[in-house]
């Protein structure tokens, strides 16, 4: 199961694995999973997320970002997710910066 732990204003849902002993991800060092979430006019993301959430909690369960907080739902086979691997946090003169890498990976359920 994935648990929604945060929804950012930029439209990313931060997910954490809660119970997924059979979840196999290619990189074992992954710390956080990110799904690309729609801006409300990006229908492909809206439809994908609505379908995913409705499969867990029934029709019409998506009504806004606030209802995604602490939601959990199963991971589907072959769903593409963003894997954000933040390796180093470095402070630079005049401000802070995060050195990390976000990339598309494919996640498989056994």
Swiss-Prot record:
Keywords on record: Membrane, Sarcoplasmic reticulum, Transmembrane, Transmembrane helix
Transmembrane residue ranges: 33-53
Any Gene Ontology CC annotation: sarcoplasmic reticulum membrane
Chief place of localization: other
Topology with respect to the bilayer: Single-pass membrane protein
UniProt KW Transmembrane keyword: yes
Subunit structure: Homodimer.
Localization per Swiss-Prot or TrEMBL: Sarcoplasmic reticulum; Sarcoplasmic reticulum membrane
Protein known as: Putative protein SCAMPER
Reported function: Putative sphingolipid-gated calcium channel.
């Amino acid at each position: 199961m994935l648990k929604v732990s945060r929804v950012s204003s930029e439209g990313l849902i931060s997910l954490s694995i809660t119970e997924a002993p059979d979840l196999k991800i290619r990189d074992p060092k992954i710390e956080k999973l990110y799904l690309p979430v729609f801006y409300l006019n990006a229908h492909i993301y809206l439809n994908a997320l609505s379908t995913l959430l409705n499969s867990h909690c029934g029709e019409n369960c998506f009504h806004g970002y606030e209802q995604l907080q602490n939601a959990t739902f199963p991971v589907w086979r072959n769903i593409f997710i963003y894997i954000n691997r933040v390796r180093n946090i470095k402070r630079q003169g005049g401000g802070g910066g995060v050195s990390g890498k976000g990339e598309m990976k494919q996640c498989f359920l056994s």
